[in-house]
A protein has these predicted regions:
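Ferredoxin-reductase
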Residues: 2-93, 150-152, 176-179
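FNR/FR-type flavoprotein reductase catalytic core
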Residues: 81-191
Length: 191
């Protein structure tokens, strides 16, 4: 897939449209390309290089719906200087984008079969576009099962969305945590 700029080594300008806290150290940012240009198309499994001016850049998986061309969505855990800086960006702040890069998952090869997706912690973020694609083309597949594990209930990403998917019946969503409080009513154990 083509880069966001004519020269893939040069970041294209984008602005933070929305910032949402997922967990204590993880944020989801929605980015809009400068000059209201469409976001570059991407496929499930790809990533962008996000550039924080004056700090550096980091490879961050795309975590949004690949069918939406109006924005890019990235889920970032604040662990180093670049990811901490990107996570702290407020609405309207500038960020550079290069990409998308990487090989897409060949979901079309699973047509007619059951699909099981297994993720742990932040690993759900790069799999989320695949889940969006599977939902958009749901009739092409057998059962779709998501097995997702985190350290604790407070580490579950996209909680509202996972509940919506679970209640829709379109995806069999199973969540397990390593350590649970007495109030946790789900599975306990590792994925």
């Amino acid at each position: 897939m083509p880069s966001t700029a004519s020269d893939p080594s040069v970041p294209a300008a984008a602005r933070v449209l929305r910032r949402h806290r997922e967990t204590a150290d993880t944020w989801t940012l929605e980015l809009k390309m400068a000059n209201d240009s469409p976001a570059p198309p991407f496929a499930p499994g790809q990533f962008n290089m996000l550039y924080l001016f004056g700090v550096g850049e980091s490879a961050i998986s795309l975590s949004g719906d690949p069918a939406r061309s109006d924005r890019l969505v990235h889920t970032v855990r604040a662990v180093g200087p670049v990811s901490r800086g990107i996570s702290a960006l407020s609405r309207g702040a500038a960020v550079g984008v290069r990409g998308p890069f990487g090989t897409a998952w060949p979901l079309e090869h699973a047509a007619g079969a059951d699909v099981v997706i297994v993720a742990g912690g932040l690993g759900l973020a790069p799999l989320r576009p695949a889940l969006y694609r599977l939902l958009a083309t749901r009739r092409r597949y057998g059962r779709v099962v998501l097995l997702y594990g985190t350290r604790s209930p407070s580490d579950v990403l996209f909680q509202r969305e996972l509940e919506q998917w679970r209640h829709s019946g379109e995806i069999d969503v199973r969540i397990t945590v390593d350590h649970a409080l007495e109030t946790w009513r789900g599975h306990v154990g590792v994925v």
